[in-house]
């Protein structure tokens, strides 16, 4: 029996492949309705808003994680944003009507970038810490889980819960 800690990259890669398959299937569907209300804001999104958010958050959070890693600091490195970030809101509004096919194309490329990022993180780097403005100190493994892999899974579930048109 191995006493080595589990490799987060392997788990993240497996989860990424699974959520990519879910999103691929969802991109083929025409969905209507709105998501369940966000627990914090009460906000409800249509499918276009969810796809636009998928298209904007993946590159953003990869860049934030890379920034934390590049700082090579023993102290937690400030990173991130909140839901109220104006650039986030503007990107979602700007792209929500682009169409699922175009947004899925962008998301698929972003997922490939995420796959490459995950492969590039060393075992030691998974413990490097960042400092989020509201969530506090988080190691890279938690940043990736919360803002990338888990976030993708959350929005895939939102899309799955919308009605087919």
Task: Name what the model sees in each region.
Residues 46-47, 99, 139-140:
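Short, structural beta-strand-to-alpha-helix junction motif
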Residues 21-48, 70-76, 120-136:
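Helix-loop segments that flank and shape redox-cofactor active sites
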Residues 124-127, 154-165:
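Long amphipathic alpha-helical segments
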Residues 16-23, 47-65, 85, 90-93, ...:
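Alpha-helical transition-metal enzyme core signature, strongest for iron centers
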Residues 134-148:
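Individual transmembrane alpha-helices with interfacial aromatic-anchor signatures
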Residues 1-12, 60-107, 164-165:
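Short, helix-capping/interhelical loops that line the mouth of catalytic, cofactor-
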Residues 95-99, 125, 137:
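A general structural signal for short secondary-structure boundary/capping elements
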Residues 54-57, 72, 121, 133, ...:
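Alpha-helix boundary/capping residues
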């Amino acid at each position: 029996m191995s006493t080595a800690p589990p490799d987060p990259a392997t788990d993240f890669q497996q989860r990424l492949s699974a959520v990519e398959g879910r999103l691929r299937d969802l991109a083929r569907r025409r969905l209507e309705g709105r998501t369940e209300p966000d627990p914090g804001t009460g906000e409800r999104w249509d499918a276009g808003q969810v796809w636009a958010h998928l298209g904007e958050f993946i590159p953003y959070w990869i860049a934030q994680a890379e920034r934390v890693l590049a700082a090579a600091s023993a102290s937690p490195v400030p990173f991130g944003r909140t839901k109220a970030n104006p650039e986030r809101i503007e990107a979602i509004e700007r792209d929500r009507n682009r169409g699922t096919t175009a947004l899925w194309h962008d998301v698929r490329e972003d997922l490939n970038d995420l796959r490459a990022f995950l492969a590039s993180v060393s075992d030691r780097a998974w413990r490097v810490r960042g400092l989020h403005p509201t969530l506090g100190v988080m190691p890279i493994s938690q940043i990736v889980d919360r803002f990338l892999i888990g976030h993708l899974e959350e929005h895939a579930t939102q899309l799955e819960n919308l009605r087919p048109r």
